[in-house]
């Protein structure tokens, strides 16, 4: 029987679009919904509530191919004592270095990993342990360029490729679940975890404590990113931390035994 994680790192997300904190629905920019008046104040609020880490995505950068919201990202990083990981439009060694020099803990690359594997490898060598790959997929097929393009590449295949190139970890997002609160794609996550030799963080669709407990039962999964579930009030950060974070008080319900299959 494979081991389960003792706990998950529960990571609030802040997605930046035109300087605002928003949430998308299934990756659709036309359905962007503002979720906070001030991204910096929201970041500080998550940290004050006990978040161990913050996940920031520059949606403008993901679309354009170059980070757009750098001033806001810098203010977030400088205002927090917790680590911040950033993705969106990081497609060069220079941009990765710039973000890390600002104090970002991890950079997350997506399109680069698919389209420019040589630069990915150079990046992982230049910044060991600090380059993660975001694998975003529709029906198992990897999407790039801010989720606007879908490739024939299957997610597990990309996992194997990028870990061989030195990626420190994987953030897997099921686009069809993102922003829906419909639950994570456990079957696809199992396929990712079956081939991954690096830490994996799940994102997309998490809408309840039951979803988090289901994720906790998956072997080698180390974290979960929460967006709409927190902003809609479906889950409070404190509840999530108590359920699956370090020192959690809630055991797995018996029915999650089926998740081993």
Curated annotation (Swiss-Prot):
Pathway(s) served: Amino-acid biosynthesis; L-histidine biosynthesis; L-histidine from 5-phospho-alpha-D-ribose 1-diphosphate: step 4/9
Cell compartment(s), UniProt: Cytoplasm
Single GO MF annotation: 1-(5-phosphoribosyl)-5-[(5-phosphoribosylamino)methylideneamino]imidazole-4-carboxamide isomerase activity
UniProt-listed InterPro entries: Aldolase_TIM, His_biosynth, HisA_bact_arch, Isoase_HisA-like, Isoase_HisA-like_bact, RibuloseP-bd_barrel
A single cellular component GO annotation: cytoplasm
Alphabetical keyword list: Amino-acid biosynthesis, Cytoplasm, Histidine biosynthesis, Isomerase
Active site residues of this protein: 15, 136
GO biological process, one term: L-tryptophan biosynthetic process
The enzyme's E.C. designation: 5.3.1.16
Reaction(s) the record says it catalyses: 1-(5-phospho-beta-D-ribosyl)-5-[(5-phospho-beta-D-ribosylamino)methylideneamino]imidazole-4-carboxamide = 5-[(5-phospho-1-deoxy-D-ribulos-1-ylimino)methylamino]-1-(5-phospho-beta-D-ribosyl)imidazole-4-carboxamide
Domain of life: Bacteria
Family: Belongs to the HisA/HisF family.
Name recorded for this polypeptide: 1-(5-phosphoribosyl)-5-[(5-phosphoribosylamino)methylideneamino] imidazole-4-carboxamide isomerase
Organism: Synechococcus sp. (strain JA-2-3B'a(2-13))
Gene assigned in the entry: hisA
